[in-house]
Curated annotation (Swiss-Prot):
Keywords: Heme, Iron, Metal-binding, Monooxygenase, Oxidoreductase. Disruption phenotype: Abolishes the production of pseurotin. Pathway: Secondary metabolite biosynthesis. This is Cytochrome P450 monooxygenase psoD. It comes from Aspergillus fumigatus (strain ATCC MYA-4609 / CBS 101355 / FGSC A1100 / Af293). The gene is psoD.
Length: 518
């Protein structure tokens, strides 16, 4: 489950040496009045900024040059797409041509081109994708949905006991809903060694996308230097060894438990017991499980934190959420998955939270063109990398008339172009651009949506979400800011969580006592 990652300045994929002169507007400036360097193109400017800065640069270029803008970096061509219709035409309808990858050098080196999110479109990638889809299908059965429901109840109860711990508890929840179904164990504390170790490594891995941290991503000549001469190359080698070592160590641990008969029911156990049903290689399988862990934990955590902030910033929507869950569920029990079809406002807030976060802090994963193509009269050379810019796509004026505003009503009211019926099914996140396009769309969107919707519903039923106050009773408002990395998390902010009433708190506490978590 590679949920909404980031691609930047990657080498052209499987290109030949043929050179073409016909092309779209070639961007020679990194900003108005500044020319790109000969051969280097825009690489120096892009290498000097972090992810958030690059999103801003791409948006400004698109505003200056149009919805399809081409630039070069070290001779490699890249294209910026800022309209959904163009992204769907190329990535979906012409997906057979536009589904390759050309990951940044550091990412390819560390993952050895085996991570299915960044791997080139080859037979191995197809096998891995099939394996991921099988895993997602397994999690949709009632048994695993019950695990998600229980994990959400555990988390809400923990927040009632320790309201200031929401950053850590949401992190624990994001891990535990995945580990309980995928790996066969729950994590009961944000300080669990599994979380700590994986978070430490993932933080370093996310930096491997950044050209300011790994200059070999944009300057190929640096890849030829000896490791002792360039610290970032030594870091890449260390991360590669850790990445491989941890994956195989965990695999051996699960195999041992299965052999002893003590392994808990989970997807990893199912895979090992039914190995003949999967045609992935052993190496592909361990990389696939690691990719599901990395992608499946980061996105829910990011969106849960964003949700809290938005409920403080837009209290009218918190009130609407609470009114809906009260009307549908009542006061005597917490929401469950059987209520979800009757909670369109909850689902609308989930989808709008994902949209809102994506427009301020996310880019699409680059799609690499596998063969020459012509679109809208423009010629594109094989190996060109196309970047869908969510900050523009999800604010398209025709589709999102008030795009800068957090407004879940756009999914609920017929006056908006995004409205769909029936409301027992819509809104949902299937096919939503924030999760990618075509063959490279996130295969875990359904899992991610189920993880979020049950938690949003339970939080709305149980708690009031408010700005913290100082000793004089004044609200301590903040601006929402994100990390400068791919799939960024919100930076630390304050929030005041309180039970809506004592009866609800008691119901949650009693339910938590009877949980049978793994």
């Amino acid at each position: 489950m590679i949920i909404s990652s980031y691609h930047l300045l990657a080498p052209r994929c499987r290109r030949d040496q043929k050179v073409y002169n016909k092309s779209i507007h070639v961007l020679n400036t990194v900003a108005k009045g500044i020319k790109g360097w000969p051969f280097l193109g825009s690489a120096p400017a892009l290498a000097a900024v972090d992810t958030n800065g690059i999103i801003g640069i791409f948006k400004s270029w698109a505003e200056q040059y149009g919805s399809i803008t081409q630039f070069s970096a070290m001779g490699d061509k890249q294209v910026i797409l800022t309209e959904d219709k163009d992204a769907r035409e190329l990535f979906v309808r012409r997906g057979i041509k536009y589904s390759d990858r050309g990951a940044p050098h550091a990412v390819e080196y560390i993952s050895m081109k085996q991570n299915p999110g960044f791997r080139p479109k080859d037979d191995g990638w197809r096998r891995q994708r099939s394996m991921i889809q099988s895993a997602i299908n397994i999690t949709s059965i009632n048994k695993y949905q019950s695990l998600m429901d229980d994990e959400a109840t555990f988390t809400v109860n923990a927040l009632l006991q320790s309201p200031d711990s929401f950053h850590g508890e949401f992190l624990r929840y994001s891990y535990s809903v995945l580990t309980s179904s995928l790996l066969g164990f729950s994590v009961r504390s944000p300080s669990d060694p599994f979380i700590h170790h994986n978070e430490t490594f993932t933080a370093e891995l996310m930096n491997s996308f950044r050209p300011d941290c790994f200059p070999s991503n944009v300057f190929p000549v640096l890849r030829k230097l000896p490791m002792w001469l360039l610290p970032s190359l030594r870091t890449m080698e260390r991360l590669r060894k850790e990445y491989v070592g941890e994956m195989w160590a965990f695999r051996r641990k699960i195999e041992k438990l299965v052999k002893e008969g003590s392994a808990t029911e989970c997807i990893y156990k199912h895979f090992l017991l039914h190995r003949d049903q999967y045609n992935v290689t052993e190496e592909e399988s361990v990389h696939t499980f690691q990719a599901m862990i990395d992608g499946g934990t980061r996105s829910p955590h990011n969106n849960l934190l964003t949700f809290l902030f938005l409920m403080m910033e837009f209290p009218e929507w918190q009130k609407k959420l609470q009114e809906e869950v009260d009307r549908v569920v009542g006061r005597d029990r917490m929401p469950s998955y059987r209520d979800i079809p009757n909670l369109p406002t909850v689902r609308a807030i989930v989808k709008e939270t994902v949209r809102y976060r994506s427009i301020v802090a996310e880019m699409g994963i680059g799609h690499c063109l596998q063969t020459d193509d012509i679109y809208k009269g423009y010629f594109f050379e094989k190996g060109t990398v196309f970047n869908a810019i969510f900050a523009s796509i999800l604010m398209d004026k025709d589709t999102y008339p008030d795009g800068k505003l957090f407004n879940p009503a756009r999914w609920l009211e017929p006056s908006y172009p995004t409205y769909k019926e029936p409301l027992t099914t819509y809104p949902n996140c299937q096919g939503f651009p924030a999760f990618g396009y075509g063959r490279r769309a996130c295969p875990g969107v359904d899992f991610a949506e189920r993880t979020l919707v049950i938690m949003f519903a339970k939080l709305g039923w149980t708690m009031n979400i408010r700005w913290p106050r100082d000793e004089d009773g004044n609200e301590l408002r903040e601006e929402l800011q994100y990390e400068p990395v791919p799939a960024p998390r919100p930076l630390k902010f304050g929030c005041r969580l309180e039970a809506r009433d004592a009866d609800r708190a008691k119901i949650v506490e009693e339910a938590a006592k009877h949980l049978k978590l793994q």
